[in-house]
């Protein structure tokens, strides 16, 4: 059940990114709706816009994948520190200036 929920969240996230990219590029590249078909300039603009956004998304995901292990280790250390100090809530330990 948890796996299905994760798959649904992934699909939702993908569709949100796709819809936002489509909206952004369409607003940027299609100034009028006077014709049914896109002209060559509009098609080239849409292709370039989508390509840039996809490339940016890939770079962000690569950075996220690179940084994620360090973030996980930090959260584990914060959790262990909070568990070691009885009577102090985990949120207080993590949010304190010395926990940064």
Curated annotation (Swiss-Prot):
GO terms for molecular function: metal ion binding. InterPro entries: Mito_inner_translocase_sub (IPR050673), Tim10-like (IPR004217), Tim10-like_dom_sf (IPR035427). One of its GO terms (biological process) is protein transport. It holds the Pfam family zf-Tim10_DDP. Keywords: Disulfide bond, Membrane, Metal-binding, Mitochondrion, Mitochondrion inner membrane, Protein transport, Translocation, Transport, Zinc. A motif (Twin CX3C motif) lies at residues 25-49. The keyword Ubl conjugation does not apply. It is found in: Mitochondrion inner membrane. Coiled coil: none annotated. It comes from the Eukaryota. It is a peripheral membrane protein. GO terms for cellular component: mitochondrial intermembrane space protein transporter complex; mitochondrion; TIM22 mitochondrial import inner membrane insertion complex. Gene3D superfamilies: Mitochondrial import inner membrane translocase subunit tim13 like domains. Disulfide bonds join 25-49, 29-45. Component of the TIM22 complex, which core is composed of TIMM22, associated with TIMM10 (TIMM10A and/or TIMM10B), TIMM9, AGK and TIMM29. The twin CX3C motif contains 4 conserved Cys residues that form 2 disulfide bonds in the mitochondrial intermembrane space. However, during the transit of TIMM10B from cytoplasm into mitochondrion, the Cys residues probably coordinate zinc, thereby preventing folding and allowing its transfer across mitochondrial outer membrane. Component of the TIM22 complex, a complex that mediates the import and insertion of multi-pass transmembrane proteins into the mitochondrial inner membrane. The TIM22 complex forms a twin-pore translocase that uses the membrane potential as the external driving force. In the TIM22 complex, it may act as a docking point for the soluble 70 kDa complex that guides the target proteins in transit through the aqueous mitochondrial intermembrane space. Belongs to the small Tim family. This is Mitochondrial import inner membrane translocase subunit Tim10 B. It comes from Mus musculus. The lineage of its organism: Eukaryota, Metazoa, Chordata, Craniata, Vertebrata.
């Amino acid at each position: 059940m948890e796996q299905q929920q994760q798959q649904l969240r992934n699909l939702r996230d993908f569709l949100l990114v796709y819809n936002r990219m489509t909206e952004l590029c369409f607003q940027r590249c299609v100034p009028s709706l006077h014709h049914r078909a896109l002209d060559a300039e509009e098609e080239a603009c849409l292709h370039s816009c989508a390509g840039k956004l996809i490339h940016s998304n890939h770079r962000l995901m690569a950075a996220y994948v690179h940084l994620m292990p360090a973030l996980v280790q930090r959260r584990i250390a914060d959790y262990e520190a909070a568990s070691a100090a009885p009577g102090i809530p985990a949120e207080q330990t993590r949010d304190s200036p010395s926990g940064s």
